[in-house]
C-alpha cells in the first residue's frame, strides 16, 4: 500500500528532527525526553528520593529522565495503554488508564504512601479533527487531575500535557482551585505545528473533605 504524502512528509520531518537525532545519540527512547529535561532545567521539579507517577509513559522517554533524577532512593510508577520495555527500578502498569481496573492497579502500586509528583504526557490518537480530538484529550486530562488529587501529598506538584481548545479554560480554572500556582509553558522541543502546551501546577492544597 502506497504511503500518503502526509505520512511521507511526517516521516521526513521525523528523520531530520534534531531532537530525534539527539535522542538516538543520548540513548533516550523518544524526543519527548527533551521536553521534560527542559522543564526540569528551568523549574527543578524532580529531585532525588521523590515518589513519582508517570502517566502515558510509553515508550519511556519521561520515565528514563525521571528515574535518573530521583535515583535509587526514589520510586517511579509508570503506566500506559501501550507496551513499554522495562526500565530499572520502574514499576510499569500496562492498560487503559480510563478503565477502573487499571486505575485500581495504579492506586494499589502507590499504596498508602502519597507521591511528590504526577507527570503526564498522555494524548489520544489524533484524527486531525479538533471537534473529535479535543474532547478525548480533555477527558484524559480530567482523569489525570482526578488521580493527582487522590495520590499527591499536600504541597506536591503536577505536570501535564494539554491542548488549547474547548474545555481548556474550564480545566485551568479548576486546577487553580487545587494548586497554589499554575503556569503554562511550551518547551522549545515541542514541534511548532503542535497545539500542545504543558501545565505546571505547584503546591497541591490537599483534598477538601
Swiss-Prot record:
The first-level EC class reads: transferase
Q: What is its main location?
A: cytoplasm
Q: Reaction(s) catalyzed by this protein?
A: uridine(2552) in 23S rRNA + S-adenosyl-L-methionine = 2'-O-methyluridine(2552) in 23S rRNA + S-adenosyl-L-homocysteine + H(+)
Its GO CC terms are: cytoplasm
Q: Where in the cell is it found?
A: Cytoplasm
For this UniProt entry, the molecular function terms from Gene Ontology, in alphabetical order, are:
rRNA (uridine-2'-O-)-methyltransferase activity
Query: InterPro entries given for it?
Result: RNA_methyltr_RlmE, RNA_MeTrfase_FtsJ_dom, rRNA-MeTfrase_E, SAM-dependent_MTases_sf
Active site positions: 161 (proton acceptor)
The record's listing under SUPFAM superfamilies reads: S-adenosyl-L-methionine-dependent methyltransferases
Its function, per the record, reads: Specifically methylates the uridine in position 2552 of 23S rRNA at the 2'-O position of the ribose in the fully assembled 50S ribosomal subunit.
Q: Provide the family line.
A: Belongs to the class I-like SAM-binding methyltransferase superfamily. RNA methyltransferase RlmE family.
Q: Which NCBIfam families match?
A: PRK11188.1
Please give the name of this protein: Ribosomal RNA large subunit methyltransferase E
Task: Please tell me the species this chain comes from.
Answer: Pseudomonas fluorescens (strain Pf0-1)
Amino acid at each position: 500500500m502506497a504511503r500518503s504524502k502526509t505520512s511521507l512528509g511526517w516521516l521526513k520531518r521525523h528523520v531530520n528532527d534534531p531532537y530525534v537525532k539527539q535522542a538516538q545519540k543520548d540513548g533516550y527512547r523518544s524526543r519527548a525526553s527533551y521536553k521534560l529535561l527542559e522543564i526540569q532545567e528551568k523549574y527543578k521539579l524532580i529531585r532525588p528520593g521523590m515518589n513519582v507517577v508517570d502517566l502515558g509513559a510509553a515508550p519511556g522517554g519521561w520515565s528514563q529522565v525521571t528515574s535518573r533524577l530521583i535515583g535509587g532512593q526514589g520510586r517511579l510508577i509508570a503506566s500506559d495503554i501501550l507496551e513499554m520495555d522495562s526500565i530499572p527500578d520502574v514499576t510499569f502498569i500496562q492498560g487503559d488508564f480510563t478503565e477502573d481496573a487499571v486505575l485500581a492497579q495504579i492506586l494499589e502500586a502507590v499504596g498508602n504512601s502519597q507521591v511528590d509528583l504526577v507527570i503526564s504526557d498522555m494524548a489520544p490518537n489524533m484524527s486531525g479533527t479538533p471537534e473529535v480530538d479535543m474532547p478525548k484529550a480533555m477527558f484524559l486530562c480530567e482523569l489525570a487531575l482526578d488521580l493527582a488529587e487522590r495520590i499527591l501529598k499536600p504541597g506536591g506538584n503536577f505536570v501535564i500535557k494539554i491542548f488549547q481548545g474547548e474545555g481548556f479554560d474550564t480545566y485551568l480554572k479548576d486546577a487553580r482551585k487545587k494548586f497554589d500556582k499554575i503556569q503554562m509553558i511550551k518547551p522549545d522541543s515541542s514541534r511548532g505545528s503542535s497545539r500542545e502546551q504543558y501545565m505546571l501546577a505547584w503546591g497541591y492544597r490537599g483534598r477538601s473533605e
